[in-house]
Amino acid sequence: MCTSIVEVVGADGAGKGGDGWFDLTHPVVSYDHPHHALLEEAITIDFVNAALGPGARVAVELTLESAKELSAALARAIAAAEIEESARLRQRR
């Protein structure tokens, strides 16, 4: 079943592909048939820089449960990073 679930957001960072590191422009998050993982459906995250061609891509295919765990881990890390950033800003004042 094709779900047509696709989310695209801008990104400022870097990814490491087969040819080394490259600047990221955006990740594409989808829920559909995976290309490699032996799953019926998967959350797929493609970190890309379209201007650099198809080699500038890092792809991840996750089970829905693994994606939920990753999302929760990201939320915890972001919350902790925001506390660190706030403390750093207070020290500069």
What is each PLM-predicted segment?
Residues 1-93:
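Positively charged, low-complexity terminal tracts
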